[in-house]
């Protein structure tokens, strides 16, 4: 084999390996990517069905229902404009309460319910995930305090 042919073969193998590695990395990244949606966006059918997503908002007052024979809980998450029913089979966080902020991760079913695999409650009265805060500010339900630029101030997520 001539040196030039050997060099071209080596370059082709290296480029092929890099391409394969990039393809595998992008596939893994896409499989682990989870987008955030508000109840209004879910009800407007902007969220994918049967793909992992996160929804966030407030637990609607009077909506929490617990099944007696299991750990399954049903509740509604609202952004004050729309609500979506969430089903969760597990133990809820200690800070989970009606009227408090919550982020649920799971899948939107064809039945219109959100089937959560994880429920996160905010950990003090000033904390709200940045995505949820921005979404509430967009629909005019944020804290309403204008900042120096005239837009509502947002609470920083730590």
From Swiss-Prot:
Q: Which Pfam families match?
A: CcmE
Query: Where do the segments described as Disordered lie?
Result: 138-158
Q: Which residues lie on this side of the membrane: Periplasmic?
A: 29-158
Question: Residues that bind heme, according to the entry?
Answer: 123, 127
Q: Name one GO biological process term.
A: cytochrome complex assembly
Q: Matching InterPro entries, A to Z?
A: CcmE (IPR004329), CcmE-like_sf (IPR036127), NA-bd_OB-fold (IPR012340)
> Which segments does the topology annotation call Cytoplasmic?
1-7
What's its membrane topology? Single-pass type II membrane protein
**Primary location recorded for the protein, binned into one broad class:** membrane
NCBIfam families given for it? PRK13254.1-1, PRK13254.1-3, PRK13254.1-5
Enumerate the HAMAP family for this protein. CcmE
Q: Per its record, how is this protein called by name? A: Cytochrome c-type biogenesis protein CcmE
Q: From which source organism is this entry?
A: Alkalilimnicola ehrlichii (strain ATCC BAA-1101 / DSM 17681 / MLHE-1)
